[in-house]
Amino acid sequence: MTPGRSVCGLAGLAAAGLLISVLTGVLHAQARQRITQPVDNQTLIRLPGTTHPLATEANDRGRVAGGLAMDSMLLVLKSSPEQETALEQLLAEQQDPASPHYREWLTPQQFGERFGASQQDVDVIADWLQDLGFRVDSVAEGRRTIEFSGTARQVEEAFQTEIHNYQVNGAGHVANATDIAIPEALGPVVDGIVSLHYEIDPQPA
């Protein structure tokens, strides 16, 4: 082998090794921690768009009892902008036969590690919910939702809103009357809550 070819060969091996290293790093990238400040329940931000469109003054039938059970609520967690970009790229590569990631599907756990909230952030949020008296029921494997349960009073105090009864086309509903608020420290991760609004099952005649 000539010296020139030897150098080229070594350079090629080095480049291939670097590519493998980069791809391995992409495959095993961990979600970074985004909650970096202490959680202060006095320093809040409102989450726009978290009030149901049917929760209007015309439909309002008054505040619910504070002890009303509110079960299986879902706190929705969001990805960082970098995670969203990486996810879009991966989705495109999974459909590209020329990509090394073609049809390389992720398990829910792998998805959570790469595109969900970090385990540290999940732990901080779960601790915050429990400190407020909620029961944390489960955390999705993809780390995009935390299921929790409590009472209307706990929801009102935790999220700085009121839970009201509403009547819409003859059907009873329960929903928050205003957009919810959360501690500012949780803003980079928390997107909102699912199931604060639900329809009341009609009682049998």
Segments predicted by a language model, with ranges:
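Basic/polar N-terminal segments that are highly enriched at the extreme N-terminus
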Residues: 1-4, 25-30
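Bacterial N-terminal signal peptides
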Residues: 11-25
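Non-catalytic regulatory appendages
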Residues: 30-205
